[in-house]
Amino acid sequence: MRQRVRQVLVIALPIIGGMTSQNILNLVDTAMVGSLGDEALAAVGTGSFANFLAMAFITGLSAGVQTIASRRMGEGRDAETAVSLNGALLIALLIGLPLSIVLLQLVPYVFPVLNPDPAVVEQGVPYLQARVLAMVAVGMNFSFRGYWNGVNLSQLYLRTLLVMHAANILLNWVLIFGHLGAPAMGAVGAGVASAIATYVGTGYYFLLGLRHARKGGFLRKLPDADGMRTIGRLALPNAFQQLFFAAGFNVLFWIIAHTDVADQAHATAEVAAANVVLNVTLVSVLPGLGLGLAAASLVGQALGRSDPEDAKAWGWDVVRIGAAVMTVLGLPMLLFPDLILGVFLHEADTLELARGPLRLVGATIGVDAVGMVLMNALIGAGASRASMVVSIATQWLLFLPVAYLLGPGLGLGLMAIWTAQVSYRGLTALIFAHLWKQGRWMSIKV
């Protein structure tokens, strides 16, 4: 068991490190833009979320590449591990380029719907336009991430993110504030810096690919028609899953903002409390996500070796590790919520609203880890359609309608909505555990 734990951690730790570094960069970004005032911060905040939603679909390529690369590695077809990566890079170019041009034209019409404040719109529109121009690079970067994770080279993913973040912070300093002879572009400079840094990451990934993936067929040949269809079959469900998951966050905040409470000030406090609880949760679940991606690779490799029982065992082994790690990480949220919330919230009433939901998250995050690991394990086995159906159905057909009923319908407030949130995540974990135990995923051909 010790050897298996080590195998999991060798893949998972660089992924967790990379994801954590992304969150740290977001905080640095916020601090640098925050010095420009509330309008600039609101422009970047709204623009960042809109960009997350715009990019969600193309990031689905990562799962398709990882599933195929890990399967080929397990099959011993080392000369073909990077062929799916070549196909995904072409798809990222063919979809990302026209889509980014269309979005560039749509941003001035869409942004005022998200935030009607003219001062925010003035800075937010060019910020978001700069970000969407990086769509091709985002699609390619996620394709590379899937490949490195699939062939147990996740440390290259971490290394590239650190290069990107260093470039982003330097470019922020130059373009936001006008150093080294550049014009002071303010919030727009943050968007341009992020876009350039994303392309820097793509360039670095290509250099790493030439060094570490040529023997796997990198830039040597494209998949045949069946191979391209396989990438689409695996990537499309994950793309829709990512898109609906991101959109669900938007709907959740709308529900909380429209909860029937005594006055607008209380509604605003509930939105602020929810925002902090959600952001703390998103950081806390990173180890679970990293372990899930490790499970996807190990499951794919075992299936490639024609050893479905070992694949099944990998799923349960990573679940045990994930549940234990996440339960320990949840204890501070459960036992000392005010210490965590006090960093972000300074109004006593808002902190009071956030305390109960954060405790709930702390108490149940170990169960959530089970769902995260097995969802990714199923994707790694090629069952991305089943993963999509469960995720979208439980979020959109169950949780969001119940949240609307509890909030705007009955006016029960944030604690009731968060009880529904952790209950739906628990149900999702149970369904994924049932699907994993059932084992129909063992016969999927990739």
Q: Model features per residue range: what roles?
A:
Residues 5-24, 28, 50-57, 133, ...:
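Residue-level signal for short hydrophobic patches within transmembrane helices
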Residues 1-12, 69-136, 167-170, 182-236, ...:
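Short alpha-helical transmembrane segments in multi-pass integral membrane proteins
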Residues 41-101, 138-152, 156-157, 253, ...:
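Small-residue-rich hydrophobic transmembrane alpha-helices
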